[in-house]
């Protein structure tokens, strides 16, 4: 992993990535580091430490802070640790999330609903709250919240996820308007199908995989690195006038 490129320059900048242990978060953490940023991974998954080790062993700079985004004090600690270690906060990719066990709404256990909302919505709210407080102190920053095309359309069987992701988009738009004049840009990302550990069971089943590929205009799923590239673009100066928007990366799925 060569940590050099001229496409983006995030040298001396600091980024938080929640859910950075695996999948899209891992790819984004590595890409940030490759382009010069110092990266803090916040995750409950101890694999986050391995991602930071990979970055550090290849000339980058990263740290892992075990974080449950449902817990205000842990999120507050994540931001405080980053500021204490690296001196500030420029970018945040709020990516931590879970998928519910598929079930029709009337059969859904309340505890399952609460769990998805707590991680996928409240977690984003808490991260934004403490990230924005720090960015206000330092004169600005960029936040990207990972939503989903499920935040724009719906799929049966995952009502809590659909509800949470719709709300993340609304939260992103509202906050973008509140802080635009304080030089904080906030956007939502809406990936389509991405091949990650979270979706691995779909791709391991030939019949499910076949149906998914048949339903994809490009005939394939995205790789995590393709989503990570959009995150870095939105954080870069190339997107300096973009705020309060939803950026869809779904291989054309919602164009139909």
Question: Where do the model's predicted regions map?
Answer:
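Alpha-helical segment proximal to the catalytic Tyr-Lys
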Residues: 133, 177-181, 240
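C-terminal substrate-recognition "lid" of short-chain dehydrogenase/reductases
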Residues: 128, 140, 220-249, 253-254
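Active-site helix of classical SDR
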Residues: 128, 164, 172
């Amino acid at each position: 992993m060569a940590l050099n490129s001229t496409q983006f320059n995030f040298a001396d900048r600091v980024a938080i990535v929640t859910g950075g242990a695996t999948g899209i978060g891992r790819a984004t953490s590595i890409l940030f580091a490759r382009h010069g940023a110092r990266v803090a991974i916040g995750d409950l998954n101890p694999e986050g430490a391995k991602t930071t080790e990979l970055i550090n062993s290849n000339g980058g700079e990263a740290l892992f802070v075990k974080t449950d985004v449902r817990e205000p004090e842990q999120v507050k600690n994540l931001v405080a640790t980053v500021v204490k270690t690296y001196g500030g906060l420029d970018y945040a990719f709020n990516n931590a999330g879970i998928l519910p066990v598929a079930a029709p709404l009337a059969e859904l256990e309340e505890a399952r609903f609460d769990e998805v909302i707590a991680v996928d919505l409240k977690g984003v709210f808490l991260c934004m709250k403490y990230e924005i407080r720090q960015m206000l102190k330092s004169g600005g920053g960029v936040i990207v919240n990972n939503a989903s095309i499920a935040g724009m359309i719906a799929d049966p069987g995952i009502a809590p996820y659909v509800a949470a992701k719709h709300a993340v988009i609304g939260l992103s738009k509202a906050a973008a308007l509140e802080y635009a004049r304080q030089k904080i840009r906030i956007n939502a990302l809406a990936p389509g199908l991405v091949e990650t550990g979270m979706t691995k069971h779909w791709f391991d089943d030939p019949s499910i995989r076949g149906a998914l590929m048949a339903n994809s205009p490009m005939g394939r799923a995205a790789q995590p690195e393709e989503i990570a590239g959009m995150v870095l673009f939105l954080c870069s100066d190339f997107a300096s006038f973009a705020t309060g928007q939803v950026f869809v990366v779904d291989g054309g799925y919602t164009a139909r």
